[in-house]
Amino acid sequence: GKFAREFIFQIPELLKTEKNPNPTASIVPNGYLLMFGPEHAEEQYRALENHKECDAGTKNIKGSELPKIFPYINNEGIETATYTDSKIEGWIDPFMFHSALKSKATELGAEFIKGDVKSISEIKAKTIISAAGCWTKELLDDIPVVPQKHTVFRVKCPKHIPEMPLTGDLTTGVYWRPEGKEYLAGSPNSVFDAEDLEPAWNDFEELVWPALAQRIPAFEELKLTGGWAGYYDCNKLDNNAVVGKHPKYDNVYMASGFTGRGLMQAPGIGRALTELITTGSYQSINLDCFAVERVLKSNARPEPYVL
């Protein structure tokens, strides 16, 4: 994540091409705020120690202190919160980021092939990287990465708070952030292997709106203006990534199962796999904790918080 932040802030220089001389990811540096109830407080305090060791810049805020910093928040039921401010975190436009990466890769010689499969034949390759996301299990049946459908709602509120960070309420699983003059809000519900991408509209009235209005009183007046559903590539074993060499093959590597965090982890994963493939080992960050072997042996490393 730290490397991704550095990479994204350097996009204008790193991803500049002849065809795209001014690449951008439209960074909105509003920060991240995650709130926890008493049942998860101790677990989060332990996680913060790891954040400190990694110099992640994460700050702890007592639940009682939240209204002093974010006066629009109702802190009822919140024991503690973690916050990374606008100098460190925020969100970007994923389409623009993807386009900039693709443009640079093309300039460096990568070839992208898109089309309908008419027939099947062998293709010989020195190195293969499976980055098939939600469809990983269709290619490699021993890797339990499958589509997990999530719904996001777009809402409008008379009171707009443009400086609001991306906020996750772990007491309900609902998250939200500003999007232009509106807000995006995510449902805590998900469906594995869903064949359709019809939004779960009932979730808004039953789950999302009550949670938003309880936590941000101004949201009692919000109106639903739209929504959509999309897939996370979810590793059903532990909600964590599967990265590294596949032990059953001489030349197959994995980069999958990011459970909605692929964009923020992509730069670091790309660098790590480049090192592993070209030198035989990780050089910058050791990602053995995400090794394929752990999945094949069902050695879970659970990621407890997925928004």
Regions found by a protein language model. Name each.
Residues 1-69, 173-174, 212-213:
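Dinucleotide-binding Rossmann-like beta1-alpha1 core, especially the glycine-rich loop
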Residues 62-63, 114-116, 226:
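Short loop/edge segments at beta-strand edges and connector loops
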Residues 2, 34-43, 84-103, 199-204:
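Short beta-strand to alpha-helix junction loop
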Residues 16-29, 127, 132-251:
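Active-site substrate-recognition segment that forms the wall
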Residues 1-8, 41-48, 63, 97-98, ...:
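A general structural signal for well-ordered alpha-helical segments in protein cores
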Residues 216-307:
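C-terminal catalytic lobe of FAD-dependent flavoproteins
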Residues 84-127, 131:
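Helical element adjacent to the flavin cofactor pocket in flavoenzyme catalytic cores
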Residues 10-14, 104, 108, 272, ...:
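Active-site catalytic microenvironments for nucleophilic, acid-base chemistry
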